[in-house]
Amino acid sequence: MLAVRKARRKLRMGTICSPNPSGTKTSSEVCNADWMASLPPHLHNLPLSNLAIPGSHDSFSYWVDEKSPVGPDQTQAIKRLARISLVKKLMKKWSVTQNLTFREQLEAGIRYFDLRVSSKPGDADQEIYFIHGLFGIKVWDGLMEIDSFLTQHPQEIIFLDFNHFYAMDETHHKCLVLRIQEAFGNKLCPACSVESLTLRTLWEKNCQVLIFYHCPFYKQYPFLWPGKKIPAPWANTTSVRKLILFLETTLSERASRGSFHVSQAILTPRVKTIARGLVGGLKNTLVHSNRWNSHGPSLLSQERS
């Protein structure tokens, strides 16, 4: 989903990981878990902003807690409705937009992660949680899962895009940034010129993690990249035709230098969409009914492209 330079330059991805019995990989076997390490040498010195990098939307939302309070990202009307029995079960069907854990996404080749976070009412430990209507797992648990993968795959580079913050004051931000530091340590890549970042330079510095932080708080830490360095225009439509047109237009209009660019190939349900498919949920209402064709990927956040 992070499409930089040419969205149509697709990376040739193989099986998630299917080594042959001898334990070695043949030239025809590409392990998605190590696809960056497997790129041909002539791409190692190419700026990362010239690669098309797969990503996921609401990356953390493979699990949400229907027993938790409704998140601060929801309106008061939704919060009042949630007092009714079964409403949160229905909310869960529309809040879950992924079916793979962080680890499973990484092993499948995903390298860009769309992250929304929040404090939780009544939580005395100042923990920060992922949020999408309902609260997900603790951010710390997700970061540790990602770091474990990176330690085992030292040539893979990831983009963590913290783009929505809810119910967070300065203390919460400091807690979150400390967690990020504790989780990744020297793997964090300091903010610098986008054009200077290549696979080779990152490998030489043992850097694997770029953190984008859409909040002025980024100025206090050298390893936090400003959100403006990774714009992510949003089509906000249920129409596949309008989405494709939007993606083509925004890609052609993006800045040629100085930033990455996210192409959000996702359909967004409207209120009437949710009302019509209330019980069926996102997967049955949008994902199954909208496909490119028999040869193309789904546009929905339920699947990655």
UniProtKB/Swiss-Prot annotation:
Major localization listed first in the record, in broad terms: nucleus
GO biological process, one term: lipid catabolic process
Tissue: Widely expressed.
PI-PLC X-box domain mapped to chain residues: 42-215
Keywords attached to this entry: Hydrolase, Lipid degradation, Lipid metabolism, Nucleus, Transducer
InterPro entries assigned to the protein according to its UniProt record, in alphabetical order: PI-PLC_domain (IPR051057), PLC-like_Pdiesterase_TIM-brl (IPR017946), PLCXD1/2/3 (IPR042158), PLipase_C_PInositol-sp_X_dom (IPR000909)
PROSITE patterns (alphabetical): PIPLC_X_DOMAIN
Any Gene Ontology CC annotation: nucleus
Molecular functions per Gene Ontology: phosphoric diester hydrolase activity
SMART domains: PLCXc (SM00148)
Subcellular location per the Swiss-Prot or TrEMBL entry: Nucleus
Active site residues of this protein: H57, H132
Catalytic activity, as annotated: a 1,2-diacyl-sn-glycero-3-phospho-(1D-myo-inositol) + H2O = 1D-myo-inositol 1-phosphate + a 1,2-diacyl-sn-glycerol + H(+)
Disulfide-bond pairs as recorded: none
Function comment: Catalyzes the hydrolysis of inositol from phosphatidylinositol (1,2-diacyl-sn-glycero-3-phospho-(1D-myo-inositol), PI). Could also hydrolyze various multi-phosphorylated derivatives of PI, such as phosphatidylinositol-4,5 bisphosphate (PIP2), releasing inositol-1,4,5-trisphosphate (IP3) and the protein kinase C activator diacylglycerol (DAG), therefore mediating cell signaling.
Protein name per the record: PI-PLC X domain-containing protein 2
